[in-house]
Amino acid sequence: GHDSALCLLDTEQKTVFAMSTERVTRIKHDFLDITPIISEYKFDSVDYVAHSYNDFEDKGHDGELREKMTYNKDIEKAIRAIIKPTYIKDLNVSRSEKNKLIFKSLFTNFSAVKAYYGAKFKRALVKESPEGNRQAFTNYIKNNFNKYNLHPKEVFFYEHHLCHAIPSYYLSPFNGGEALALTIDGQGDGFFSKLYAFKSDTKYELIGQSSADFMGSGDRYLSIGRIYNYFTQAMDLRPNSDEGKIEALAAFGKADKDLLAQLKEATLIDKNTLSINYDIAKITPFYDIDFLKQHRAKMGDKNFCAVVQTYLEDTIVDYLNFAYEKYPISNLCLSGGVAANIIMSLNIYERTNFKNIYVLPPMGDDGLAIGSAILTALEVGEDVSWLKDYTMPYFGDEYTREQVKTTLDEF
């Protein structure tokens, strides 16, 4: 995944500490594990640890819980010890440049080079199985905590989209009452969207889901979020990071009717199962960067961006209107990376019957840390009803007024 984060839920003190890895490493949307946070902050004890994926069979072909991924993390740590990046752009080095840096480090940072090739060798020997994947990740997580004298009793694994939905409800004003919770992202555990109906904080059910079917190569998954990623890439921007620029530029354009119609014809909403599906033959061109760039050149940047933004708005509005027909509940919780699209949220408010909408502030994968922590607390029988009293979404560092004043006085 991306946007790794840590959330420490103290059910005795009724406190929350949460932080994204990028806040420590300064690598935007950092996909490394949470060890940079653990090394920077002191934690007295950790009873349980949870992870926000549980597809050990890799049915969704996202590779998140394959044993080889644990070695990929070790390889990444070794590379960073060699490159010493300050920002994410520093990681964009060519293969030849990387090899030169590795060779140079043979004489200046041999331990990092040894760790790099050691992890690559071990990765090559892996023979993956669902049981092996689970054990490998459990060991990887425990070993990383043990390095900092933290010894969790157990490691839990929860479904990706449930980890999005749970905090969007528990941290919302609707906690304890009825609400629908929609998750929408690129993909996770084989799906790009799920819809839950909450009756209360102890009773909820899955009422709709949309699968992110793998299209056979690279990062091509059938998904609204992934399509938006491809438009971002066609604009020569960074996918999973610069989508907000597409959303902003779209406001100055007008969607090309033909291309928008082509997108919509490839998209099918089943109002009975509450799922969003695709005609593979019709949607495939939208995963071709050359195809998209040709249309970008033809209609201009603003209108090109307006196509995918309008498509997103109309598709989600139509989907939620069908959902409301079956489940007429006026409260809606939104989470998942696509929920960062504020104009989509505005359209939901203006064009559906949902009157009260809550968007989880850490709507992306960083919010999964909070969701998995809440699910763990519930599983071990802890009370988390106090979470509804948290009205501010800031769970990181705290500073006193005196500390703030002292810093300001320095300027």
Language-model features: locations:
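Short acidic/glycine-rich loops and adjacent helix/strand connectors
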Residues: 1-411
